[in-house]
């Protein structure tokens, strides 16, 4: 069930083309828009540069604007 919330968050950011900051476990901050994602990776795009980031290396993803996520659709009861 946690994957559904993660998937909803990432998909909303991708569809709305919201710029995000991605913080890695080593302290590095990456910025860009989510182009695509799967179970293990996120493809970030910033201009012409693409970066494939493994999810296990990520600590935090911060959208640069508020995302409206449908919690019931994400499988999180009582949050809608």
From Swiss-Prot:
Gene3D superfamilies per record: 2.30.30.100
GO CC term, one of those recorded: cytosol
CDD domains named in the record: Hfq
Top-level lineage group: Bacteria
UniProt keywords, alphabetically: RNA-binding, Stress response
Record keyword Metal-binding present: no
One Pfam short name: Hfq
GO BP term, pick one: regulation of DNA-templated transcription
Location of the Sm domain: 7-67
PROSITE patterns: SM
One Gene Ontology term of the molecular function aspect: RNA binding
Function: RNA chaperone that binds small regulatory RNA (sRNAs) and mRNAs to facilitate mRNA translational regulation in response to envelope stress, environmental stress and changes in metabolite concentrations. Also binds with high specificity to tRNAs.
Stored PANTHER family: RNA-BINDING PROTEIN HFQ
Family affiliation: Belongs to the Hfq family.
Subunit comment: Homohexamer.
Name of the molecule in the record: RNA-binding protein Hfq
């Amino acid at each position: 069930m946690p994957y559904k919330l993660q998937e909803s968050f990432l998909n909303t950011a991708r569809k709305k083309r919201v710029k995000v900051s991605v913080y890695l476990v080593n302290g590095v901050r990456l910025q860009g828009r989510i182009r695509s994602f799967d179970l293990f990776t996120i493809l970030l795009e910033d201009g012409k540069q693409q970066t494939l980031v493994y999810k296990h290396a990520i600590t935090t993803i911060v959208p640069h604007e508020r995302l409206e996520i449908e919690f019931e659709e994400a499988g999180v009861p009582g949050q809608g």
